[in-house]
Amino acid sequence: EAGVSQADIKYASIYDSFTITVVMQIEDLGFCAKGDGGKFVSDGNLIAGVGKFPINTDGGGLCNNHPMNRGGMTKVIEAVRQLRGEANSVVQIPNCDIALAHGTGGGLGTRHGSATLIFERE
């Protein structure tokens, strides 16, 4: 375990194959209660600069056309950009010192898996 709580995480890159995927994952990761994900999102909590918990400041897979086999590396790249202060200035999270990258995958009807990485800037 990383020894951090959800409140410590300033930014998250979350796999977003579909809109509902984000809602399910923020609930499963404990950033809001089960069943409250839709309201959490519609209240603007995920928007950089104004929300409590900005995610996918690179636009995520839905914005980047979800290219085939883009994998979790794009999640790691944006998390590291945030930690280094190198994200686009419009979406840079001030004083971002802990970031999360989370992904799920697998073929439909076959094996599925997920991974969560937590990064800290020192």
Model-identified regions with their sequence ranges:
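Claisen-condensing/thiolase-fold acyl-transfer catalytic domains that form or cleave C-C bonds
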Residues: 1-122
